[in-house]
Amino acid sequence: MSRKESRVQAFQTLFQLEMKDSDLTINEAISFIKDDNPDLDFEFIHWLVSGVKDHEPVLDETISPNLKDWTIARLLKTDRIILRMATYEILHSDTPAKVVMNEAVELTKQFSDDDHYKFINGVLSNIKK
């Protein structure tokens, strides 16, 4: 399966891990999707999910200066997760930033409010510079 589908699953895993009552480990959360989606790139999903969780404070420090009149805490959970995922991938992978940004915009269109993709694109454009 494609990286796009793997990013969707990574997003959903991170969303699940952010639930207030979640005691799940990363491996447990990922194991729930393996049975239904055996063809996904689980190495990539684990890399992205664990990277975002392990580097969350640094990612937030990178994102925050690019949030005009917003704070990380005020963002929708979906937008916060997508920004963290994309920022991590831009900073720590060989995937072109343009590809990562496009995938983040598509995730935002799928999982967030209607026009938030413009906000996500703007923030990531500033981070990529």
Curated annotation (Swiss-Prot):
Q: Which GO terms describe its cellular component?
A: cytosol
Q: Which domain of life is it from?
A: Bacteria
Q: Where are the transmembrane segments?
A: none
State one molecular function term (GO). RNA binding
Is the keyword RNA-binding in the record? yes
Q: Name one Pfam family in it.
A: NusB
Biological process GO annotation list?
Answer: DNA-templated transcription termination; transcription antitermination
Keyword Transferase on this protein?
Answer: no
| Keywords assigned | RNA-binding, Transcription, Transcription antitermination, Transcription regulation
InterPro entries (alphabetical): NusB-like_sf, NusB_fam, NusB_RsmB_TIM44
What the record says about family reads: Belongs to the NusB family.
* Function as written in the Swiss-Prot or TrEMBL entry: Involved in transcription antitermination. Required for transcription of ribosomal RNA (rRNA) genes. Binds specifically to the boxA antiterminator sequence of the ribosomal RNA (rrn) operons.
- Name the HAMAP family for this protein: NusB (MF_00073)
Its protein name is Transcription antitermination protein NusB
Q: Which organism is it from?
A: Staphylococcus aureus (strain MRSA252)
Its taxonomic placement starts with: Bacteria, Bacillati, Bacillota, Bacilli, Bacillales
